[in-house]
Swiss-Prot record:
Family affiliation: Belongs to the troponin I family.
Protein name, entry field: Troponin I 3
Coiled-coil stretches noted in the UniProt entry, renumbered to this chain: none
PANTHER family the UniProt entry points to: TROPONIN I
Alphabetical keyword list: Actin-binding, Muscle protein
Organism, as annotated: Caenorhabditis elegans
Gene Ontology MF terms in the entry: actin binding; troponin C binding
GO CC annotations on file: myofibril; sarcomere; troponin complex
Disrupted-gene phenotype: Worms exhibit abnormal muscle morphology, egg laying defects and constipation.
Protein origin, superkingdom: Eukaryota
Keyword Acyltransferase: no
């Protein structure tokens, strides 16, 4: 009875809501299917636009081309080697068996033939070398003319110099020190001290005049005091008399000036 009640579907508002939800879900699925179909079609169109050569096919084609080029190169090398062997066979003469020949005339003939062939080959070699040297000289002249027209000169062959030579040269050279004082003008400055020192040097004893005068007065005073005591006075030097008279003359002049 309970199972039958569960399977019974009642009408009304709830049934309409369930129908709308089912319909919306179905529409959503249809839209998804349409979008998926469009994307697949677009992917197919895009793959068609890329062309026939996909990256994998390009890689295979590149590999095949490399293999074909290697085979062609080997074949060309084989052909060149065959041509070389063919030309060598044509130009070289098979040597006769000299050991088995006892006839001297036949041996002499073989010698003359070989000598003539060697001479001919040497002449051809000289002609070829001469032609090559002439062409090289012409090429050099043309290159010089072209460089002259361009305004450029051929670079000379530079001599290889060790890097240590330059280092030793730079270390050996001593830089001259610039002394700016030598360029200055020398000006002689005379001060009062210099004048005084010059006057001192000009005197005989290197002492000022006023010190000489005081010394002369001191020498004259003890001589006058000692004159009555000593029976025989020592003769005074002639230079002392004018020295003693000088201060007296100066005192008289000062007194006259004061009186005036």
């Amino acid at each position: 009875m309970l199972i039958e009640d569960e399977n019974i579907r009642y009408g009304g508002a709830q049934a309409d809501v369930e129908d709308d939800a089912a319909r919306k879900a179905q529409e959503r699925e249809l839209k998804k299917a349409e979008v998926r179909k469009r994307m697949e079609e677009a992917a197919k169109k895009g793959s068609k636009k890329k062309g026939f050569l996909t990256p994998e096919r390009k890689k295979k084609l590149r590999k095949l081309l490399m293999m074909k080029a290697a085979e062609d190169l080997k074949q060309q090398q084989m052909l060149k080697e065959q041509e070389r062997q063919k030309t060598l066979q044509q130009r070289t003469i098979p040597l006769p068996d000299v050991d088995s020949i006892n006839d001297q005339g036949q041996l002499l003939k073989i010698y003359e033939d070989m000598f003539a062939r060697v001479c001919a080959l040497e002449e051809e070699k000289f002609d070829i070398n001469f032609g090559v040297s002439q062409t090289e000289a012409e090429i050099n002249q043309l290159t010089i003319q072209v460089n002259d027209l361009r305004g450029k000169f051929v670079k000379p062959t530079l001599k290889k110099v060790s890097k240590y030579d330059n280092k030793f040269k730079s270390s050996g050279e001593v830089k001259e020190k610039s002394n700016f004082r030598n360029n200055l003008k020398v000006v002689k400055k005379e001060t009062d001290l210099d004048e005084i020192m010059a006057k001192k040097k000009g005197t005989a004893d290197g002492k000022p005049e006023w010190s000489k005068k005081e010394k002369k007065e001191e020498e004259a005073a003890p001589v006058e005091l000692a004159a009555p005591v000593e029976p025989e006075a020592e003769p005074e030097p002639e230079a002392a008399e004018p020295a003693a008279e000088e201060p007296e003359a100066e005192e008289e002049e000062e007194e006259e000036e004061e009186e005036e």
